[in-house]
Amino acid sequence: MTVTGGSSSLVVPMVMWGRHPPVHCISAIYLLRDQKTLVSGSTDGQVFLWEVDATSDKWEMTPRHVLVGHTAPIKCIAKASGGADAHHIVTSSENGEMFCWDTEDGRCIENKKLPGLIHTHIQAYRSPDTQGSGTNSGNTGPSGVKLFCCGFYEEIIAMDPFSLTVIFQLSSRINPDWVASFHVLRPRNRQDDVVLGKSYFLFSYFFRYFILY
């Protein structure tokens, strides 16, 4: 719909919900920390935002937004900002597309396609050193969150969740291979962050430690 007034015009998108819901074959799902918004990605590239009502014994979900932009099935969904009231997410599809969304209004903040970087797992991590300080250290987004990603490549990639740019890469000097899984954590009695990764090599599992300074 286009609203005109004088010499200016405003394009207002409108969505009409029919009697029957659209087909939505879920390929990825994520519940925001406040447990009020559920995000689901589908095999056709659409992302649904659901309003969750957990006041009763049975959780009721009502569709609120349909986010359109991906052209391939969604593989990963992760938060892009920290805190209990965080409302930014990042979605990644199997053709390398990445989108940063605002879940309050459904707005797309940034999108990029990174050829050769097909993510299969994304973990959003905020170092304890930046929590509560309001700082933006390490070239991270406004919340201090980094996205750690692995997939069909030999490294663990750290990305900025809002600009969707690569900050740094972690790779093994010995027998580099696709990383099957990983976890970022701050061990007890340590002042640095550690990435524990597991890769496939000759059908065996190798655990590798990467220390983040």
What are the residue ranges of the model-derived segments?
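Canonical WD40 repeat/beta-propeller blade segments in eukaryotic WD-repeat proteins
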Residues: P21-L31, T71-S81, L117-N139, P176-P187
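Terminal intrinsically disordered, low-complexity extensions flanking WD-repeat/beta-propeller proteins
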Residues: V3, G116-T120, T130-T135, Y153-E155, ...
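WD40-repeat beta-propellers
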Residues: V47-E51, M98-D102, I157-D160, L202-R208, ...
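Short C-terminal beta-strands that terminate individual repeats in beta-propeller domains
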Residues: V15-P21, E60-G69, C108-L114, F168-R173
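Conserved strand-to-loop turn within each blade of WD40 beta-propeller repeats
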Residues: G41-D44, S92-N95, C150-Y153, K198-Y200
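Structural hallmark of WD40 beta-propellers
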Residues: Q35-V39, A84-V90, F99, C108-E110, ...
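Intrinsically disordered, low-complexity acidic/Ser/Thr/Pro-rich linker and tail segments
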Residues: M1-S27, T43, F48-S56, F99, ...
